[in-house]
UniProtKB/Swiss-Prot annotation:
<feature type="active site">
    <location>
        <position position="197"/>
    </location>
</feature>
<dbReference type="InterPro" id="IPR008248">
    <property type="entry name" value="CheB-like"/>
</dbReference>
<protein>
    <recommendedName>
        <fullName>Protein-glutamate methylesterase/protein-glutamine glutaminase</fullName>
        <ecNumber>3.1.1.61</ecNumber>
        <ecNumber>3.5.1.44</ecNumber>
    </recommendedName>
</protein>
<dbReference type="GO" id="GO:0006935">
    <property type="term" value="P:chemotaxis"/>
</dbReference>
<feature type="modified residue" description="4-aspartylphosphate">
    <location>
        <position position="55"/>
    </location>
</feature>
<feature type="domain" description="CheB-type methylesterase">
    <location>
        <begin position="185"/>
        <end position="379"/>
    </location>
</feature>
<keyword id="KW-0378">Hydrolase</keyword>
<dbReference type="Pfam" id="PF01339">
    <property type="entry name" value="CheB_methylest"/>
</dbReference>
<feature type="active site">
    <location>
        <position position="224"/>
    </location>
</feature>
<dbReference type="InterPro" id="IPR000673">
    <property type="entry name" value="Sig_transdc_resp-reg_Me-estase"/>
</dbReference>
<dbReference type="InterPro" id="IPR035909">
    <property type="entry name" value="CheB_C"/>
</dbReference>
<dbReference type="GO" id="GO:0000156">
    <property type="term" value="F:phosphorelay response regulator activity"/>
</dbReference>
<keyword id="KW-0597">Phosphoprotein</keyword>
<dbReference type="GO" id="GO:0005737">
    <property type="term" value="C:cytoplasm"/>
</dbReference>
<dbReference type="InterPro" id="IPR011006">
    <property type="entry name" value="CheY-like_superfamily"/>
</dbReference>
<keyword id="KW-0145">Chemotaxis</keyword>
<comment type="function">
    <text>Involved in chemotaxis. Part of a chemotaxis signal transduction system that modulates chemotaxis in response to various stimuli. Catalyzes the demethylation of specific methylglutamate residues introduced into the chemoreceptors (methyl-accepting chemotaxis proteins or MCP) by CheR. Also mediates the irreversible deamidation of specific glutamine residues to glutamic acid.</text>
</comment>
Length: 379
């Protein structure tokens, strides 16, 4: 049976085009459309779609408020369409925080000319989050509850259906989560490296808000994200977390307790030595490199600089970026972990390293931060 899709947009042209694109996949069936946020809320409750594609700027009720209402009344997998502007990035991040699972840039020109690439990407994203919706429904009664925290910033609003799990002292009372927390291997670490894609913004926020200001390692983060989004995302994370988080810039010196987010549309490399490592940002126009930034490239450079003194983590994401970079790290003696299938929005990138035998441990998102701290504490 095809996944049911509700298309929400105030543009009649965009509604028709998105509907035509999605209906080309036999796994998808657009069951209805909505022209504003309030209509989306009403139809989500009535029709119970598997996936909703949602515009942000709409009359009567905007996309962000619509997401909040839908997640409160009839939780549904939602894909946001976002403009490639700083303001569009901020709005999209708000929508993700409210409960949306993923986003795509709203490119009218590519949709208008019926680009095969744009259509294929849209169908792929919708199918993937529809599968997540189906998987989540099957696990609803058995999924352990998350543990809430009080974050640094009073501006954080945690969605009640997807609360931010945390342990202010990195200790949780949830027995199921505690069971997954590993004992330290006793290895020495100089760097924490994280790679992610679809579902990454929420996963990263959930992990990073739990880390204390005195976190002993620098952190590099590669999140597949457009160039217009990464500065806004880094700024948002910095406002919520105790550690410092910034969009990486060329020449940045890696410091403990600081996280560096790879800028969208470019590549982030690590150079120097393990005790004086710096970030190098490159403009890469090579058509051979699909992702900009690329987890493989950043992880590979970390392997050259830090050898085995890296804890590398692959979180939720589509595709297999990070597999070769993680393989390079592992060959140098680094520790590689993955996010488990149950807690991923898309179990693609973690699955790639799991199947290749690269990951040493597969952890739930709820237990990831505490496990990281335990591992690097060396007992």
């Amino acid at each position: 049976m095809a996944y049911k899709v509700l298309v929400v947009d105030d543009s009649s042209f965009f509604r028709r085009r998105v509907t035509d694109i999605l209906n080309k996949d036999p796994k998808l069936n657009v069951i209805d459309v909505a022209v504003n946020g309030q209509e989306a809320v009403d139809k989500a409750l009535l029709l119970k779609p598997d996936v909703i594609t949602m515009d942000i700027e709409m009359p009567i009720l905007n996309g962000i408020e619509a997401v909040r209402k839908i997640m409160a009344q009839s939780p549904t997998s939602i894909l946001m369409f976002s403009s490639l502007t700083h303001q569009g990035a901020k709005a999209t991040l708000e929508a993700l925080d409210a409960g949306a699972l993923d986003f795509l840039p709203k490119k009218f020109s590519e949709i208008a000319k019926n680009s095969d690439e744009a259509g294929s990407l849209l169908r792929q994203r919708v199918v993937e989050i529809a599968r997540k919706s189906e998987f989540s429904k099957q696990r609803t009664r058995t999924r352990p509850a998350a543990v809430n925290i009080s974050p640094k910033s009073s501006r954080l609003i945690a969605d009640q259906h997807r609360p931010l799990a945390s342990t202010s002292s990195l200790v949780t009372k949830d027995k199921k989560v505690m069971a997954a927390i590993t004992r330290s291997s006793g290895k020495e670490y100089k760097l924490l490296a994280i790679g992610t894609s679809t579902g990454g913004p929420v996963a990263l926020q959930k992990i990073l808000v739990q880390l204390e200001e005195n976190f002993p390692l620098p952190i590099i983060i590669v999140q597949h994200m457009p160039a217009a989004f990464t500065a806004a995302f880094a700024s948002r994370l910095n406002s919520l977390c105790k550690i410092s988080i910034k969009e990486a810039a060329d020449g940045d010196v890696l410091k403990p307790g600081c996280a560096y987010l790879a800028p969208g549309g470019r590549q982030m490399l690590i150079s120097g030595s393990e005790n004086s490592a710096k970030i190098k940002i490159l403009d890469d126009d090579s058509p051979k490199i699909t992702f900009k930034p690329s987890v493989d490239i950043s992880f590979g450079s970390a392997a050259k600089t830090f050898a085995g003194k890296v804890l590398g983590v692959i979180l939720t994401g589509m595709g297999s970026d990070g597999k070769e970079g993680a393989r390079m790290l592992k060959a140098k003696g680094a520790t590689i972990w993955s996010q488990d299938e149950q807690s991923c929005v898309v179990y693609g990138m973690p699955q790639a390293i799991d199947k290749a035998g690269i990951s040493e441990l597969s952890l739930s998102l709820d237990s990831m931060a505490a496990s990281m701290v335990k591992e690097i504490s060396r007992g």
